[in-house]
From Swiss-Prot:
CDD domains for the chain: GIY-YIG_UvrC_Cho
SUPFAM superfamilies on file: C-terminal UvrC-binding domain of UvrB, GIY-YIG endonuclease, RuvA domain 2-like
Organism of this sequence: Legionella pneumophila (strain Paris)
A Pfam family assignment: HHH_5
Annotated GO MF terms: DNA binding; excinuclease ABC activity
UniProt record similarity statement: Belongs to the UvrC family.
Entry protein name: UvrABC system protein C
Domain UVR, residue spans: 208-243
Length: 618
C-alpha cells in the first residue's frame, strides 16, 4: 500500500476481495460513484490502485477521493465487460471515459411492414420498434445522405404508415424517382421485397452480391422483352458501380473495423472506419469525455488510451453482435487484446481478431483512418478553442469569479397572439445541448402578452431545475427591460440566487451587431462592438433560441389551424377530423380530394362528405 491513509474498514475490505472476474464501483464520501471498472481478478485489480508503483496523476486524484468500494462478481470476463458498459452508461462516473449514450446517435431503421417496409432515420431513448437497424452514424446528415442514396437506387418508401395507407395517388417521391409508389400498388410486394433485400445488402457493404443479382435480373428482363424494367436495373447497376469507385475497393476478403485513437488534454477522438468486403463503407468520429484534463505523464496518456479503447469496445460492439467484424485494426498495442478477442469472439459466435499497425493492403486502411483522425482532431480543436475563447470573453464582460459551465436562453414566438410558444435552449462548454432543449406551450394568458408568456415559461422551467439541482450560471432573455424585470421577479419568488441574468434586446434597427445588453444584477445597459467574442456567443445562443421557438410555433399554429378549419364544419368532431387526416395525410390533400374519395372515409356519410367538399369548393 502507498502512503494514502485508508480507513480500517476499507483496508480490511481490500484483503478480503475475491480472486474472481467482476466489476468494481469506487464511491466518494457522499456515495457518488467515481469510477466503474472490470477485472479478470478483482483482488489483484482493485489492490493495484493502492500500490506504490501506481503514480499516475489521474489514479492519485481518484484514489484520494475513494471512501468505499462495491463489487459484483460475474461468471466470466464477457459478463463483466457487459455489466461495466451498462453501468458506465447509466451512472456516467466522473473518472470513466464517457461516450455519448448510443441511443442519442442516429440509426437507419427499416420497418417490418409485411409487404412494403419503410426506411427512416431513428434516434430515440424509447424502446425501439421492431425491424432492422443500421448504425450508429456520426450525425443526422450522414443518415439522411445514406437514405437519399438508397431511395435513388432502390426506391424504398420513407413515408409514415398512416400517410401510406391514406394515399389514393402517388406522391412527389414517385415523381422524382425515389419511390415505386407501393401505396397505390405500382409495384408488387415480391418485387418490393427484392429492393428491400438489396438495400439491406447495400447497408451491409455487400455491393458485389447486389451487382451480380441485378445483372442476372436485367438479363432476364431483356430476354422477356421487358426493356423498361431492364433500363431501371441498368441504372441501379450504374449508380452502384459509381459508389464502389468512390469508396475505393480493395481486393481482400473478410470484414474489418479500423480504429485510430488520439488522446489530448481534455478530450479524445476515436476514428472508426468500417470495411466490408474490401470497401470503405463508413468513417465515423466519436469524441468521448476523458476523465482528467491534465495529461502530464506518459503513464496517464497510455492508460487513458487503453481505457478509451475498452470503453469504445463496450459502447460500440456489445449491444449488437451483428456489428462485430472478423478483424479490428488499431494504431496502438492493446494491453488486454487477447482477453478482448476472446470476449468479442464469444459474443459473436465466431472468431474476431485484434491487429496492431498492419502491413500491406491493411496499412492503407490504417493510413486512411489516421488521416481522417487528424482532420477530425483539427476541426474539434478549432471549434472548441473558439467556444472557449468566447466563454472566457463573456466571463470577463460579466466580471464573474467562476467559469461559465451552463447557460440557458428563453424566447417567445407567436403570430399576433396565436399559438404562443416559449423556447429554452441550453449551452455548455461544448456548445449547444439540443437534447436538453425544451418547448413550452403557453396557455391561459391574454393573446400577445409576451410578459405573461415569459413569466409562465420561466416559472415552469425553474421549478423543475430547482428540484434537479441543475441551475444555469447565466440566464439570457431575448427581450427588453420589461421582460427581464419579470424574469428577475420570478427568480426572486422561487428563491433562486447566484444566477447572472442578462437581457438581449435587438435595438431600434433590429440589426445584428446593434443588440443592447441589459445586465440586471448591476442595473446597467450597454452595446458591445461588432467584433466582440462575447457578443458573438450571445448572438449564437439568442439565434438558436429564436430558431427553436419559431419552429415550434409554426408547427403548433399549423395544427391549430387544421383543427379549427375542420371542426368549423358542422358534423366534424375530433374523431372524424382524425379519420380524415389519417386517410388523406393532411388538409391540403383533403382539399384536393374528389367527393367519392371523401365518402370512403369511415364515419363520413354522403351528406357530410358533400358538406366537407363544399367547404373547400364553395
Amino acid at each position: 500500500m502507498n502512503d494514502l491513509q485508508l480507513s480500517a474498514e476499507l483496508a480490511l475490505f481490500l484483503t478480503k476481495l475475491p480472486s474472481e472476474p467482476g466489476i468494481y464501483r469506487m464511491l466518494d464520501e457522499e456515495g457518488t460513484v467515481l469510477y466503474v471498472g472490470k477485472a479478470a481478478n478483482l483482488k489483484k485489480r482493485v489492490n493495484s490502485y493502492f500500490s506504490k508503483q501506481n503514480t499516475g496523476v489521474k489514479t492519485r486524484a481518484l484514489v484520494s477521493q475513494i471512501k468505499s468500494i462495491e463489487i459484483s462478481v460475474t461468471r466470466s470476463e464477457t459478463e463483466a465487460l457487459l455489466l461495466e458498459s451498462n453501468l458506465i452508461k447509466a451512472l456516467r462516473p466522473k473518472y470513466n471515459v464517457l461516450l455519448r449514450d448510443d441511443k442519442s446517435y442516429p440509426y437507419i431503421h427499416l420497418s417490418n411492414h409485411p409487404d412494403f417496409p419503410r426506411i427512416e432515420l431513428y434516434r430515440s431513448k424509447k424502446k425501439p420498434p421492431s425491424g432492422n437497424f443500421f448504425g450508429p452514424y456520426p450525425g443526422v446528415a450522414a443518415v439522411r445522405e445514406t437514405i437519399v442514396t438508397i431511395q435513388k437506387i432502390f426506391k424504398i418508401r420513407n413515408c409514415r404508415d398512416s400517410y401510406f395507407k391514406a394515399r389514393s395517388r402517388p406522391c412527389l417521391q414517385y415523381q422524382i424517382k425515389r419511390c415505386t409508389a407501393p401505396c397505390v400498388h405500382y409495384i408488387s410486394p415480391e418485387n418490393y421485397k427484392l429492393s428491400v433485400e438489396d438495400a439491406i445488402r447495400f447497408l451491409q457493404g455487400k455491393c458485389q452480391i447486389i451487382l451480380d443479382a441485378l445483372a442476372e435480373r436485367m438479363k432476364q428482363a431483356v430476354n422477356q422483352l421487358n426493356f423498361e424494367e431492364a433500363a431501371v436495373l441498368r441504372d441501379q447497376i450504374k449508380n452502384l458501380r459509381l459508389i464502389q469507385e468512390q469508396q475505393g475497393v480493395v481486393q481482400l476478403r473478410g470484414d474489418a473495423d479500423v480504429i485510430a485513437i488520439e488522446v489530448r488534454p481534455g478530450f479524445a477522438c476515436i476514428q472508426c472506419v468500417t470495411i466490408r468486403e474490401g470497401q470503405v463503407l463508413n468513417s465515423q468520429s466519436f469524441f468521448p469525455t476523458v476523465p482528467y484534463a491534465v495529461l502530464d505523464e506518459e503513464l496517464d496518456a497510455n492508460s487513458l488510451w487503453q481505457q478509451t479503447f475498452e470503453a469504445f469496445i463496450g459502447f460500440y460492439y456489445l449491444d449488437t453482435t451483428e456489428r462485430i467484424p472478423d478483424l479490428i485494426i488499431t494504431n496502438q498495442s492493446i494491453t488486454e487484446s487477447r482477453s478482448l478477442e476472446y470476449i468479442l469472439s464469444q459474443r459473436r459466435g465466431k472468431s474476431c481478431k485484434i491487429q496492431v499497425n498492419p502491413r500491406g493492403v491493411k496499412s492503407r486502411w490504417m493510413d486512411f483512418a489516421v488521416n481522417n483522425l487528424r482532420i477530425s482532431v483539427a476541426e474539434y480543436v478549432s471549434k472548441h478553442s473558439t467556444i472557449r475563447s468566447r466563454y472566457q470573453a463573456l466571463k470577463q464582460l460579466l466580471a464573474l469569479d467562476k467559469n461559465i459551465e451552463r447557460m440557458e436562453c428563453f424566447d417567445i414566438s407567436h403570430t399576433q397572439g396565436e399559438a404562443t410558444v416559449a423556447s429554452c435552449v441550453v449551452f455548455d462548454t461544448e456548445g449547444p445541448r439540443p437534447s436538453e432543449y425544451r418547448r413550452f406551450n403557453i396557455e391561459g394568458i391574454t393573446p400577445g402578452d409576451d410578459y405573461a408568456a415569459m413569466e409562465q415559461a420561466v416559472t415552469r422551467r425553474f421549478k423543475r431545475l430547482i428540484d434537479a439541482q441543475l441551475l444555469p450560471d447565466v440566464l439570457i432573455i431575448d427581450g427588453g427591460k420589461g421582460q427581464v424585470s419579470i424574469v428577475k421577479r420570478v427568480l426572486t419568488s422561487l428563491g433562486v440566487e447566484d444566477i447572472t441574468l442578462l437581457g438581449v434586446s435587438k435595438g431600434p434597427s433590429r440589426k445584428a451587431g446593434w443588440e443592447k445588453l441589459i445586465l440586471v444584477n448591476e442595473n446597467r445597459e450597454f452595446v458591445l462592438p461588432e467584433d466582440s467574442k462575447a457578443l458573438h456567443l450571445l448572438q449564437h445562443i439568442r439565434d438558436e433560441a429564436h430558431r427553436f421557438a419559431i419552429t415550434a410555433h409554426r408547427k403548433k399554429r399549423q395544427k391549430t389551424r387544421v383543427e379549427s378549419t375542420l371542426e368549423s364544419i358542422e358534423g366534424v368532431g375530433a374523431k372524424r377530423r382524425q379519420a380524415l387526416l389519417q386517410r388523406f395525410g393532411g388538409l391540403r390533400e383533403l382539399a384536393k380530394a374528389p367527393l367519392e374519395e371523401i365518402c370512403k372515409v369511415q364515419g363520413i356519410s354522403e351528406q357530410l362528405a358533400k358538406r366537407i367538399h363544399e367547404h373547400f369548393h364553395p
